[in-house]
Amino acid sequence: MNLQEKIEDLRKRTLSDLLSVADEKTLNNLRTVMLGKKGELTEILKGMKDLTNEERPVIGALANAFRDEFGAKFEAKKLEIEQAVMNAALESETLDVTLPGKAQKKGSRHILTQTQEEIEEIFLGMGYEIVDGYEVETDHYNFERMNLPKDHPARDMQDTFYITNEVLLRTHTSPMQARTMDAHDFSKGGLRMIAPGRVYRRDTDDATHSHQFHQIEGLVVDKNITMADLKGTLDLVMKKMFGQERELRWRPSYFPFTEPSVEVDISCFKCGGKGCNVCKHTGWIEILGAGMVHPNVLEMSGLDSSVYSGFAFGLGQERIAMLRYGINDIRGFYQGDVRFLEQFD
């Protein structure tokens, strides 16, 4: 039997076998056995080395025609098998389209967003404006304009993510004090603003620390602003946030950009000041830092510190939310666990 006859015989057997194939695995096996690298056609074509130059094109064309014919019938058979499998599945499986589908999880505003909006609403009612700032900040505004010149020892209080020697991720929202004072026209009146936003520190993440968290900076600058104005403002805000029965305690502290500086404590809202695990049995909870704007900060913004004065404060959104809702791990705010978040819907 010559090569032409062998190819024709292989063609007939292959197409005959193709008609009886009933599943995709058998179909693929047939293609491999007949046309694969070690298949029958390959073995037949090894004999082409013995053909004359005139015979080789004829046998080659015959082999290619066989491959093309088989390829077309193979694809048609494959579609036929797939359709048969689908039809069988439709007959054997039932679907009740009247059954309710899986309910989608209901979204809601994040608890930190809710906290921020509540604080903003309080200050808007007091005539404050809300300003946004840069999360990528310059060393000049983040430190130097906050009375922290190069090599100032107080810079060690904050571990910083530096991008370049002069560009960094802001460590507090305080740079907005300087930026807002620079842009404000004090000839038209004083300045009252809050600046909410994310800040970054090189902290190790644990239950009470995060490398990223939220602050709300507050600033008031005008003529004749005193510590009494600061105390009255924070007393009003804290009572709106934690209840009218709350008391505030003021302790001397140190911040480079305020003088004098204070730490503000609030009477424990859980035990009423009697002592419990929330207040560590002291009756008081540390809530924020504040103070009168340092004269150097005012002067660097072009203001005469003998004429203008002001106060500033910083609120931590996570801390307020943790205290109000009894949350003991700050990481819950950022892990995206719906079971945690839906508690505050």
Swiss-Prot record:
Q: Which co-factor is required?
A: Mg(2+)
Key words, A-Z: Aminoacyl-tRNA synthetase, ATP-binding, Cytoplasm, Ligase, Magnesium, Metal-binding, Nucleotide-binding, Protein biosynthesis
Q: Name any one GO molecular function.
A: tRNA binding
Q: Which InterPro entries match?
A: aa-tRNA-synth_II, aa-tRNA-synth_II/BPL/LPL, Phe-tRNA-synth_IIc_asu, Phe-tRNA_ligase_II_N, Phe_tRNA_ligase_alpha1_bac, Phenylalanyl-tRNA_Synthase, tRNA-bd_arm
Q: How is the cofactor bound?
A: Binds 2 magnesium ions per tetramer.
List membrane-spanning regions.
Answer: none
Q: What is this protein called?
A: Phenylalanine--tRNA ligase alpha subunit
Organism in which the protein naturally occurs: Lactococcus lactis subsp. cremoris (strain MG1363)
Q: Which gene encodes it?
A: pheS
